[in-house]
A protein has these predicted regions:
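An acidic-aromatic substrate-binding cleft motif
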Residues: 1-18, 22-31, 35-40
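Aromatic- and carboxylate-enriched substrate-binding clefts and catalytic-loop regions
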Residues: 28-207
Length: 207
């Protein structure tokens, strides 16, 4: 399911019915994934980050929506962009200086990210698709990178770790948080070899 943008809980439930009509008789319940567009501060074609504490007006109750999806017979999944977050309560030192995204090398920022994953899983979502982390960390898409991916003039909070170690630490924390709820992880715009064993699926694309 790949349908980001304008959506609503009603549209998700209608699409759930359609998905079930295509999978009638299948013993393994399909996943129905809510893509970008559900989050509180979503602004179409402008902003697709957090906070990830609640849905917007078209998604008034994310926990109830997951329950309705389960009642229909699918396994609820959801999309998140964990590092882009405009919550004004987040301290500046938790952010990467060159773009303002969360810096997972900072222990408190990493804990904040983990809490977001735990919250979403606690609502009843059994699949987490985390997206954009490579771009949000390094400011480049896959086709733009080379052997030197980092721009000059900035650094992560923890200067004692390499970029690869920081990326893997992020993947590990997401995986541990989701595993407490037996949730499946899809990586999107992730670095494949660093995510080995820490993602159940890796969406092909610009990673």
């Amino acid at each position: 399911y790949y349908a980001y943008g304008e959506s609503s809980d009603r549209e998700i439930l209608n699409d759930t019915d359609y998905l079930l009509s295509l999978t009638s008789g299948v013993s393994n319940p399909p996943f129905m994934v809510i893509d970008d567009g559900w989050q509180e501060n979503h602004r179409i074609n402008e902003y697709n980050g957090g906070p990830w504490k609640r849905g917007n007006g078209k998604f008034p109750d994310m926990k109830a929506l997951a329950e309705k999806m389960k009642e229909k017979g699918v396994r609820p999944g959801i999309w998140v962009r964990l590092l882009l977050n405009e919550d004004r309560k987040i301290p500046g030192e938790w952010r990467i200086s060159h773009n303002g995204c969360l810096d997972p090398s900072h222990p408190e920022a990493l804990r904040y990210i983990r809490e977001d994953v735990e919250r979403i899983c606690s609502w009843g979502y059994q699949l987490i698709k985390h997206d954009f982390s490579t771009f949000d960390l390094f400011g480049k898409w896959g086709f733009e990178t080379n052997f030197q991916t980092e721009a000059s003039g900035w650094n992560f909070y923890d200067r004692g770790k390499t970029g690869a170690e920081i990326v893997k630490q992020l993947y590990e924390e997401i995986f541990r948080a989701a595993s407490e709820y037996h949730a499946v992880i899809i990586g999107c715009n992730t670095i494949g070899h660093l995510g080995a064993g820490l993602m159940h699926l890796n969406r092909t694309g610009d990673g």
